[in-house]
């Protein structure tokens, strides 16, 4: 499986505070581990298919990671809140 962090993901992470950036990084690492090894999610992590190949992962209620999962390719697209994810999906 191949993982790619899109420039839009990197740009979106810059808007967070340092402690939130660390939480986003930890969640992304957990997702990579879970998807590459076909492991179950740990408690406290939500994973939801949104539309088409777009999925959302979250740990807690505030911060979400939007990624596109197409076969063997996982592209991390955006980190943000619920409204950021909805706004992105409306335009893509």
For each feature predicted by the language model, list its residue ranges.
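Short, structured coil/loop segments at alpha-helix boundaries
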Residues: 17-25, 47, 51
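Proteins with a high burden of low-complexity, intrinsically disordered sequence enriched in S/T/G/P/A and R
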Residues: 7, 20-21, 35-36
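A short, surface-exposed loop/turn module that caps and links secondary-structure elements
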Residues: 30-58
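Generic recognition of well-ordered alpha-helical segments
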Residues: 11, 26-30
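Hydrophobic alpha-helical segments and their boundary regions
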Residues: 15-17, 27, 41
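Enriched for short, Lys/Arg-rich terminal
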Residues: 2-4, 11-15, 21-22, 55-92
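Extended rod-forming repeat segments used as scaffolds/tethers
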Residues: 27, 45, 90-91
């Amino acid at each position: 499986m191949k993982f790619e962090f899109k420039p839009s993901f990197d740009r979106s992470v810059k808007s967070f505070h340092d402690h939130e950036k660390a939480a986003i990084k930890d969640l992304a690492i957990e997702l990579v581990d879970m998807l590459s090894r076909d492991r179950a999610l740990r408690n406290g992590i939500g994973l939801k298919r949104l539309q088409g190949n777009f999925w959302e992962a979250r740990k807690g209620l505030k911060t979400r990671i939007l990624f596109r999962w197409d076969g063997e390719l996982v592209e991390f697209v955006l980190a943000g809140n619920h409204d950021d994810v909805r706004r992105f999906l409306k335009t893509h």
